[in-house]
């Protein structure tokens, strides 16, 4: 393997970007039509992923932006960026603060402190947003478009039945590196593209700080391992990643596979068939 193959493979040409653009837009239209719905709901966070999905969707279906900030954890500028994007795209949008809803859920378990269940508390916000997304979806006859990318899906960096609760993942096969390329190709504002990615789970939270690795390096590791089928030694030559970190990434991917899997169903027919053949 030549040094740099991982990064080179992640870079999309202009022709490839156009192909991705067309494929995603056609798929959005197809899913909306097959679902017999009128359009799509996108939860706009002011971040790059939701901005890209909204930009793509706005070109082909009736898109509606739902901006759901929690003042306790979201920066006001993010909501403003979401509003500015919706206006620039010419799509309808609504701002609904979810702080009181989140606080009411927290209050239902007053004996639990934040240190005891930090993850449980953090996951409440994406799950509240999922409820709001589907409330709007049911009211208006729209599908819910998710904003997760391939890096997040592989790493399990999303909330099960939260931001993972959607009808379609338009950019779910694009690594974060490619999301940035697509965003520039589609004209997403540079101030959105350049801001540190954050799930907005708490004040000052960023994806890269929480995962302990930069997206650029992480994408090289994931792309090299899963798309190119390279060994650790080959990936290490290209990225310089140490074996302990590589192993940690692979373990996280494995441990979070359940998040993207269909809930298991006990195969009763098989059990009864076996019983009757004895």
Pin down the residues of each PLM region.
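ATP-dependent adenylation/nucleotidyltransferase module used to activate substrates
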Residues: 2-158, 235
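A non-catalytic, amphipathic alpha-helix used as a structural packing/dimerization or gating element
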Residues: 19-27, 174-185, 227, 248
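A glycine-rich phosphate-binding loop feature that marks nucleotide/adenosyl-phosphate handling sites
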Residues: 43-46, 196-201, 270-271
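Helix N-cap / loop-to-helix initiation motif
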Residues: 49, 175, 189, 214, ...
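Catalytic subdomain that performs nucleotidyl-dependent activation
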Residues: 87, 118-129, 143-220
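Short, amphipathic alpha-helical "recognition" segments used to contact nucleic acids or chromatin
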Residues: 218-229
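Intrinsic disorder and flexible/low-complexity segments
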Residues: 232-278
């Amino acid at each position: 393997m030549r040094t740099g193959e991982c990064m080179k493979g992640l870079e999309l040409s202009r022709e490839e970007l156009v192909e991705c653009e067309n494929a995603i837009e056609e798929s959005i239209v197809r899913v909306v039509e097959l679902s017999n719905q009128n359009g799509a709901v996108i939860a706009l966070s002011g971040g790059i992923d939701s901005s890209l999905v909204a930009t793509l969707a706005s070109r082909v279906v009736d898109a509606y932006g739902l901006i759901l900030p929690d003042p306790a954890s979201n920066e006001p500028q993010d909501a403003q960026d979401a509003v500015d994007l919706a206006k620039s795209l010419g799509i309808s949008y609504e701002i609904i603060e979810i702080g009181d809803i989140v606080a009411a859920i927290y209050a239902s378990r007053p004996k639990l402190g934040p240190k005891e269940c930090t993850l449980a508390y953090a996951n409440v916000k994406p799950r509240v947003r999922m409820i709001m997304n589907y409330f709007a979806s049911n009211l208006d006859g729209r599908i819910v478009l998710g904003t997760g990318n391939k890096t997040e899906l592989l790493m399990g960096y999303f909330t099960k039945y939260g931001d993972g609760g959607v009808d379609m993942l338009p950019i779910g096969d694009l690594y974060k590196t490619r999301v940035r390329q697509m965003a520039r190709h589609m004209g997403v504002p540079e101030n959105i593209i350049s801001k540190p990615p954050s799930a907005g789970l708490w004040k000052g939270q960023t994806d890269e700080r929480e995962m302990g690795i930069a997206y650029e390096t992480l994408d090289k590791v994931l792309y090299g391992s899963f798309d190119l089928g390279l060994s650790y030694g080959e990936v290490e030559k290209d990225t310089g990643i140490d074996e302990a970190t590589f192993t940690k990434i692979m373990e996280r991917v494995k441990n979070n596979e359940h998040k993207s899997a269909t809930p298991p169903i006990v195969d009763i027919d098989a059990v009864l068939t076996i019983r009757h053949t004895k």
